[in-house]
């Protein structure tokens, strides 16, 4: 039987219910990977005019449809529109280093700058959405990542120590900005986006990037504002965050997230995430990106098949995918073998139904 995309499958995952069949999910997939899979050139069209953007999203949505996703992952990030941005990448300080910088920063213009770029892209996405599918994502970047881009990671620590009131005001303003943009987003695109999310990397391989106390004091109160807004609009919320963040997981779950994505085997096996949190939230991912990059293609589908069946049996709401994303450096054959592993799991489950 031909595969039928059905966004309701992903709603089951976000409700932490076992879906009728295994879904696949990715946070981000490089359009350069999509070009190789589809044998079409379109990645650069996203920055063009209306006709170019329409063609980009036609191909973009076709990729998700043909790769058997049930939702189309898409976001427009906040940091790309911030004047003076780039500190999050390292090597430079952000535009806000003191109270005077905070006061003169053009906060009242940021929402306008965001929508000048984002609106056309969201509209083109919606116009090209395949039947049976809905979008997943929305306004990209979380509270901590925006603070890193505005100040710089190291300088955030100095600011917190030297002027904690300034730190608190910075995070309040970031929260205000996110609420302002998300409010407009939900007014315009709630019908098209069935699941909302943002990504905010709070950790690395051995711990959180800043102390759990700092995260609880400055970051999570602003999370709550956005999550409450999303949930108030009747949308489930998916949180993406990399790193060893076990110290704050219970705090984030208490805010009302419905599911979490991102894992790395060097930090903890995915089975551990299921054991700790699978009774409370949906969990997405499970396939370490290193596996896709390092293993031979013939080995990947077999390993994905074995792991995916195990994760699906142990978790309630589960969607298979990479533990992070599919950047341009992932071998396209490795990615396709992961999708093949998911297809084989579905096929095996259908066979089991017929036998039983």
Question: Where do the PLM segments sit?
Answer:
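N-terminal hydrophobic/helix-forming segments and targeting peptides
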Residues: 87-88, 92
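Active-site loop segments of alpha/beta catalytic cores
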Residues: 1-53, 59, 70-74, 93-94, ...
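Glycine-rich, N-terminal phosphate-binding loop and its surrounding beta-alpha-beta segment
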Residues: 56-84
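Detector for C-terminal structural segments
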Residues: 32, 80-86, 330
